[in-house]
C-alpha cells in the first residue's frame, strides 16, 4: 500500500459514496438552476416569458432585442453602472481587506487592555443585520455631506466585522510568533513587519477576505438606495431596480441586465479560485 492510500476500513462504502454524489448533484443543480434560468429568460420577450417554459428556450431568440431595449431604457448608462459597481466593490475590497487584516493581526498578536471587549464588539457586529444600520449610516453620511458621492458606498462597505474576524483567525494560525520576534530582534519596526512579512504570509487569506467584501459590496442594495440619487453614480443593482419600477417594463431586458451583472462576479471567482481555496484552508489548522 502506498503511503498516500487510504486504508480500506476508512474508505466510504459504495452506498455512502452514491448518496454523497447524489446530494452533491442536487446541491449543484440548486446553485446553478437560477443562473441557467436567467440565461434562458434573457433570450425571451415579455410574451414568451409568460407563455413558454422558463427552463427552455423559445422558438424566437430575443437576446439582441433585449440588449437594445436595455441600452435604450437605461439611456446608455448600463455599462456605467457596471463600472460603478466594479469601482465601489474593488476599492471597498482593497481598503476593507487591509483594515481587516491589520485589525485581525493586532487582535491576534498583541496583548492590550480591553482586547476581549473589542473582540466581543466585533462578534456582536456579525449578529447585526446590515439593513438595520442603513438609516444610521445615512444620517452620519448626510451630516458630513458625503451622500450622493462614491464615498457613501465605499467607506461603509470597507468596514467588515466578518473580515476582521477572519483576519484574526488567519493571523493567529498562519503568522508564527517566532518570525515576528526575529524581525523585532533585527530592529524592524512594527509597521515594517506588517507590510513586509505579515501581508506576504496572509496573501491567500487576504484574497478570501477581499472576495467576501467585494461580493457584499456588489450585492449591497439598501445603502445605495438611501444615499445615491444621481443616475450616473448608481451601482448596477440600484440601476436595475429603477428599471423594474417603470410602467410595463421589458422583463427580458431586465433579466438580461441581471445576467450581465453576474458575469463579473463569476469571472472574479474563477480567476481567484486557487488563492481563495488556499486561503480558506489557511485558517483551518493552527501552525
What are these regions (language model features)?
Residues 16-287:
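A structural signal for multi-pass alpha-helical bundles of membrane permease subunits
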Residues 1-13:
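Short, Lys/Arg-rich, polar N-terminal cytosolic tail immediately upstream
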Amino acid at each position: 500500500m502506498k503511503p498516500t492510500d487510504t486504508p480500506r476500513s476508512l474508505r466510504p462504502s459504495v452506498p455512502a459514496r452514491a448518496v454523497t454524489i447524489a446530494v452533491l448533484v442536487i446541491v449543484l443543480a440548486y446553485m446553478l438552476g437560477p443562473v441557467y434560468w436567467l440565461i434562458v429568460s434573457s433570450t425571451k420577450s415579455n410574451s414568451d416569458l409568460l407563455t413558454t417554459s422558463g427552463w427552455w428556450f423559445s422558438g424566437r431568440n430575443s437576446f439582441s432585442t433585449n440588449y437594445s431595449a436595455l441600452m435604450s431604457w437605461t439611456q446608455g448608462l448600463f455599462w456605467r453602472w457596471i463600472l460603478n459597481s466594479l469601482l465601489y466593490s474593488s476599492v471597498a475590497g482593497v481598503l476593507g481587506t487591509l483594515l481587516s487584516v491589520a485589525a485581525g493581526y493586532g487582535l491576534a498578536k498583541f496583548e492590550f487592555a480591553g482586547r476581549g471587549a473589542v473582540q466581543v464588539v466585533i462578534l456582536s457586529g456579525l449578529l447585526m443585520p446590515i439593513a438595520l444600520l442603513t438609516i444610521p449610516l445615512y444620517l452620519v453620511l448626510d451630516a458630513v455631506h458625503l451622500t450622493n458621492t462614491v464615498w457613501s458606498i465605499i467607506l461603509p462597505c470597507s468596514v467588515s466585522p466578518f473580515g476582521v474576524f477572519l483576519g484574526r483567525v488567519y493571523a493567529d494560525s498562519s503568522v508564527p510568533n517566532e518570525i515576528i520576534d526575529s524581525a523585532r530582534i533585527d530592529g524592524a519596526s512594527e509597521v515594517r513587519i506588517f507590510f513586509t512579512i505579515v501581508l506576504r504570509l496572509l496573501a491567500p487569506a487576504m484574497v478570501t477576505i477581499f472576495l467576501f467584501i467585494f461580493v457584499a459590496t456588489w450585492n449591497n442594495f439598501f445603502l445605495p438606495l438611501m444615499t445615491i440619487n444621481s443616475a450616473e453614480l448608481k451601482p448596477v443593482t440600484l440601476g436595475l431596480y429603477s428599471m423594474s419600477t417603470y410602467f410595463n417594463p421589458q422583463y427580458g431586458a431586465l433579466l438580461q441586465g441581471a445576467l450581465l451583472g453576474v458575469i463579473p462576479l463569476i469571472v472574479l471567482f474563477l480567476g481567484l479560485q486557487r488563492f481563495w481555496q488556499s486561503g480558506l484552508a489557511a485558517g483551518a489548522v493552527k501552525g
